Structure formats: structure tokens, C-alpha cells
């Protein structure tokens, strides 16, 4: 494989020295970019973009052609695993993801297969290898998956939910059934991420989008325990380099200490945490990724730069910080403002790495 021309993202995740703080954005390949909207129109719909390796590669690279980002992230969806388990993923206009089959009984869960990454999710593996080849060493490629808890909520609710009442009711009424589902999902996520690593992903992130909606005790039992299981089963070295693992629980700021014990190299932070406090709490164990409020990108350029400067100062000197948003970039953001953000991180962070 081609040598990396820019490895500061991987170095920061491993707390090795860097020249400037690396930066990428969750959902950096997305609807805020006119070129993405053109590709999506050409593909026909969102799932056609995800399931065609050439289209997935095209949109993954678009933000890198526009901005000096330090990492690419595979263009895909967290719900590819439930779809490969036979749940029948589809998208309703204005409603988000839905499933034709909904999980409601132990029998439903027992019948679920564990997908084979090559056979059942081969289009994702093909996309990873295609993107890696096209990147040609420009920057590292991040693979990803949803967490078992987050995937389970979609499978039990049948789609998005505000209160996760069916999944939470299952947790309290029938924990045995939910644990079986989460265990199957943990096995599936482990093999899926390992498949991505073997196909060329140089770091992986687990998105625990809905873990922060659980009580502290339920988070430990139904979310963190399964992420810990996944982390322990991942390939951690490939092609002569460490493969860093990032865990991101949105609204998980109260539990950083226990997340830091899960075995990952880095924790993603949403914008409700103060990154300097997070560093004092867990910075000796893990790197940190984040954590600007994505809506700051609607503000004027000077305000964006000011907030970048504040977060950099809060983290302070030294490596171990990957700058990112606290969640995905939103569709109405002006692409010029995203550029201001990325350039500000590089320009204003150099002083912290001298």
C-alpha cells in the first residue's frame, strides 16, 4: 500500500507529536456540498449512493478536493448491518430511515443471522478498497459502524424515535431478549469493522448516537458493555501500523471515565462537554476528538475562528486532540464557513505544538 503523505490524524489519536491539530468533520461528505447533491441526483437516491462503490468513493473524496482535511471517512450508513440481517431498510421522504421488519419478540431475535462482511456487505468492503486506492496516501481513511445499542433502537422501533419506548421497555421487561439482540449486533459490528480494516480502513469509529439517552446504569449494561466487547475483538494493527479506535457516545459526557476504560484509543465528545475538563479527567488514558457545536458554522467567519481558538486553548498544549464538530455538519451550512473552520484549526493550533 502507498505510504501516507499526511498521517497527523493517526498520530494525534495515538498521542504522538504533530505539527498542527488534525481536523475532519462528521458528515463531511454530505448535503451542504453542491457536488454531493449533484452526485446524489445522479445516483437516484441515498441508498444507491451507499451501495455503489464508485458513487461512495466519489462523494467520500469530494470534501477532500475542497478542503485540507486530515482524514477521509467512508461514505455509508450505520444501518447497513440491520439491512444485511434482513430487516429491509428503506427511506421515507421527510421521515428518515424505516425498516420493513420490526423486532418485537425473542423469536424475531433468534431468527436474525449474523451478516458475513464479504458476502452480505461486500459493497461496503468494495467501497473501502476503492476509496483507499483513490486516496493514494493523501490522508488516512476512517471506517465506521453504529453501536449495538444504537442499531438495536432502530430495529426495535422500526426507524427513528424520540423516546425509544419499545427498546427501553424491552430492556426492563425482557432484558434477556435485548441482550441476545445486542450480542448478535456486537458480533456483527466486530466482523464488519474488521472487514473494513482488512479492506483498507486505517482507523475506525463506533457511533453510539443514542447511548446518551439511557440512564447511567442502563448505559453501562446495554451500551458500553457491548462496545467494550467489540473493541476487544478488533484488529488493532494492520499493514505495519496501529489501527486506532474511536468511541463516540453522544451526550456521554457524564461517563467519560468509564468509556475511557473500554480499551479504545480515543473518545469522541459532543459540544456539551468542555474539552479541557475532559482532558483533565481522561486525557492520560485516551485522545479526544471534538467538539465544536455544529451550529457555530451558521455564525460569521470571525465568530467561527473565535470558537475554534477557544476550544484549542481549552485543550491546551500537546498532541492527543483531533478537532471535529460535536456532531454531524448540517445540510444548510455554507461550504465557505466549513472552509473557515478547517483553516482556522490548522492556523491557530500550530502554537500548541511547538
From Swiss-Prot:
GO terms for biological process: protoporphyrinogen IX biosynthetic process from glutamate. PROSITE patterns: UROD_1, UROD_2. Keywords: Cytoplasm, Decarboxylase, Lyase, Porphyrin biosynthesis. It catalyses: uroporphyrinogen III + 4 H(+) = coproporphyrinogen III + 4 CO2. Pathway: Porphyrin-containing compound metabolism; protoporphyrin-IX biosynthesis; coproporphyrinogen-III from 5-aminolevulinate: step 4/4. The record marks 77 as: Transition state stabilizer. Signal peptide: none annotated. Catalyzes the decarboxylation of four acetate groups of uroporphyrinogen-III to yield coproporphyrinogen-III. This is Uroporphyrinogen decarboxylase. It comes from Pseudomonas entomophila (strain L48).
